[in-house]
Amino acid sequence: MPQDAPAGLAPGFLVAAPALADPNFNGSLVLMAEHHAQGALGFVVNRPGPITVADVLGGLDAGLRERAEGAGRADDLVLVGGPVQPERLWILFRPGPAAPEEGAVALGAGLALGGSRELLEALVRARDPGPYLLLLGYAGWAPLQVEREVGEGAWVPLPLQGDLVFDVPMEKRWETAVRRLGLDPAGFLVGGGGAEA
């Protein structure tokens, strides 16, 4: 049965219904960063890409790559944040005493988001920056598109919970989100939709 889409989906999560056939979003957990009359913006937080943090940093500065290697972060996979602007780098991190705040937007629940080279460099150079994820690309929705998709049952909204991003292993994030909705992943069936590619 279709449900009414909530007025404000960000900050929060969208949990993809199993019937969502779009290969960019099947089985995905999307962190919604913006939702307004002009559309919506979010990031898939459970889809690893083919490159590592070292690959990204090596293209910027060899010293940054060495710093990431020393911190044990060089082999972390960069996530595919979505199909829009797949070359654009975003940084999702947990703000803390050593994490920079300039150039970032606080989302709530212990999460912040930015996209500048300066922010990335500051996080990598910080003595103890806390957890962070690098994402390439984002998911975008036209005006009223995400509301329609939620109403059709392609996505189920979930309130923002920072631990889903940094304390739950990437391969368990979707299943954990489904269970937090009070649903059984094996029996969770609805249909349709997909963000802009």
Curated annotation (Swiss-Prot):
Any GO CC annotation of this UniProt entry: cytosol
Superkingdom field: Bacteria
InterPro entries in the record: AlgH-like
Short name of one Pfam family: DUF179
Family: Belongs to the UPF0301 (AlgH) family.
Protein name, UniProt field: UPF0301 protein AnaeK_4073
Gene source species: Anaeromyxobacter sp. (strain K)
